[in-house]
């Protein structure tokens, strides 16, 4: 059974959190944080968060502080962030993007805009993770094939030229050590 994507909504307004949950519907599981500190604590405890909907202007630890913590811990690599804020200050919007947000939705917003952007961001991150897995698998497979080829060639060299196949394997090990420095 596939689990629903888990969305963390960090907003100091209970009404805004309820509105976002109502707009997004039953297709997601929700976590709620009333401030930045609670959002950070939830991200420390949970590894199953698929998306963060973040308000920038909150008392105490604000959205910018949350983004700095996420950047420091490299959580932005795993958790996309959509800022939903009433601020129209271009400097704040630019600052949010510089800190690593994926998207920015300005309040008041259209229902369809929130739905589409959330769906698109989740889909893009899922594709990115799948591609990363594929590339990683290919790199491991290529390295395995390379090691296998060197082993075969060392046996061929030993058999054909009466040279030590062990010598070829030692050269491979030394080369590998030098390349990793």
Pin down the residues of each PLM region.
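Receiver (REC) domain active-site loop signature in two-component systems and cognate sites
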Residues: 58
């Amino acid at each position: 059974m596939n689990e629903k994507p888990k969305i963390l909504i960090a907003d100091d307004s209970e009404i805004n959190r309820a509105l976002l949950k109502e707009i997004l519907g039953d297709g997601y599981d929700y976590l709620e944080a009333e401030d930045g500190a609670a959002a950070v604590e939830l991200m420390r405890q949970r590894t199953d968060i698929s998306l963060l909907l973040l308000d920038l202007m909150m008392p105490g630890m604000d959205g910018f502080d949350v983004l700095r913590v996420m950047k420091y811990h490299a959580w932005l690599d795993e958790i996309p962030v959509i800022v939903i804020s009433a601020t129209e200050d271009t400097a704040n919007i630019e600052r949010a993007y510089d800190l690593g947000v994926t998207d920015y939705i300005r309040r008041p917003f259209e229902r369809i805009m929130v739905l589409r952007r959330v769906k698109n961001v989740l889909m893009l991150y899922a594709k990115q993770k799948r591609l990363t897995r594929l590339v990683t698998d290919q790199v491991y497979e290529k390295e395995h094939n390379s090691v296998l080829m060197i082993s075969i060639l060392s046996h061929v060299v030993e058999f054909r030229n009466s040279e030590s196949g062990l010598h070829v394997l030692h050269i491979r090990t030394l080369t590998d050590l030098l390349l990793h420095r």
